[in-house]
Amino acid sequence: MLLMLSQWLQGLSPEFGFFRVFQYLTFRAVMAAMTALLIGLLAGPKVIRMLTALKIGQPIRGYAMESHLSKSGTPTMGGVLILGAIAISTLLWFDLSNRFVWVVLAVTLGFGAIGWVDDWRKVVRKDPEGMRSREKYFWQSVIGIVAALYLVFCISENSNARVFELFVTWIQSGFSMDLPPQAGLLVPFFKEVSYPLGVLGFVILTYLVIVGSSNAVNLTDGLDGLAIMPVVMVGASLGVFAYVTGSAVYSKYLLFPYIAGAGELLIFCSAMAGAGLAFLWFNTHPAQVFMGDVGALALGGALGTIAIIVRQEIVLAIMGGIFVVEALSVMLQVTWFKYTKRRYGEGRRLLKMAPLHHHFEKSGWKETQVVVRFWIITMLLCLIGLTTLKLR
């Protein structure tokens, strides 16, 4: 919005030439981060008071850790603060004509809406289950598949008209079409190694990455500050990849596929980092507010969508290794429990408690130890992910 305003002012008179600074992506990225940070810090206390007044407190289930029982009643659904700060800051600072940012915003707010309904049912309607799993996955799948069908052609072409033409051609050809190299699966640490996916393969991969990332972040969000800081670090790192991928010069030098317009995602990533740090101010131990599903599902979906656009799905799995391991710990725990119950008549557990962060708590780690150590691991994983920019 401010970019368009600056361009309009420059057209009116040469005296407004200093507004040329708005043309620089890096300047707008810094301003987006600062704007989201300030919005979050200033609005945070008011949002917390509002959630407290509405009695939107976190319910603690009976099988939870004893040390968590004192958290019962802490305001939840604080993710609305994060999403609000991200949306306002992004809309202010990004190029409104950029399709990729609109897609990420739509996916983020769509998953946020799913999380909001889930939280609302748990907290207000006093339904401990919230949205049923099938219902939640259905709506996640709808958003994921729609986003995938658009992105598969959007990444292949630079104009909306051509995107529609490609979609029609794909249908007329019997759902069979070759995609350009930039739509392939990139393998990190190797020069120009890209596996062609085809339309169906791209859609399936996109669906799995977006929905999987969303749920993985949600499963990680179980301790004060545990999920939000890794989201900030991974999001900021993806912003670097977006900047490189969207630059014809840097992408050619670093042997990355050039995707016109992808660089504008740096604005969204910066806003997400700023909003996340603002939320951490209130979410650090002992937390004054929890993000709830409205925040966790949305942020995870955003990370997955950005990774798809900049073609860094595997790197996302590396940098977001904590999210991956947390999700796998739940799946393995449930699978092993069901298998042993059928085979031996009683369910057995691989971990003392899932997700993994609760296993470490049961093993004697303090909550703050788990959180900070997971942060350190994420920082190292993000550095490894960033080395793929040059080590190829």
UniProtKB/Swiss-Prot annotation:
Belongs to the glycosyltransferase 4 family. MraY subfamily. It comes from Paracidovorax citrulli (strain AAC00-1) (Acidovorax citrulli). It catalyses: UDP-N-acetyl-alpha-D-muramoyl-L-alanyl-gamma-D-glutamyl-meso-2,6-diaminopimeloyl-D-alanyl-D-alanine + di-trans,octa-cis-undecaprenyl phosphate = di-trans,octa-cis-undecaprenyl diphospho-N-acetyl-alpha-D-muramoyl-L-alanyl-D-glutamyl-meso-2,6-diaminopimeloyl-D-alanyl-D-alanine + UMP. It is found in: Cell inner membrane. GO terms for biological process: cell division; cell wall organization; peptidoglycan biosynthetic process; regulation of cell shape. Pathway: Cell wall biogenesis; peptidoglycan biosynthesis. The chain crosses the membrane at residues 24-44, 76-96, 100-120, 137-157, 193-213, 225-245, 262-282, 289-309, 314-334, 369-389. GO terms for molecular function: metal ion binding; phospho-N-acetylmuramoyl-pentapeptide-transferase activity; UDP-N-acetylmuramoyl-L-alanyl-D-glutamyl-meso-2,6-diaminopimelyl-D-alanyl-D-alanine:undecaprenyl-phosphate transferase activity. Its cofactor is Mg(2+). It is a multi-pass membrane protein. Its main location: membrane. CDD domains: GT_MraY (cd06852). This is Phospho-N-acetylmuramoyl-pentapeptide-transferase. Catalyzes the initial step of the lipid cycle reactions in the biosynthesis of the cell wall peptidoglycan: transfers peptidoglycan precursor phospho-MurNAc-pentapeptide from UDP-MurNAc-pentapeptide onto the lipid carrier undecaprenyl phosphate, yielding undecaprenyl-pyrophosphoryl-MurNAc-pentapeptide, known as lipid I. One of its GO terms (cellular component) is plasma membrane. Keywords: Cell cycle, Cell division, Cell inner membrane, Cell membrane, Cell shape, Cell wall biogenesis/degradation, Magnesium, Membrane, Metal-binding, Peptidoglycan synthesis, Transferase, Transmembrane, Transmembrane helix. Its EC number is 2.7.8.13. Pfam families: Glycos_transf_4, MraY_sig1.
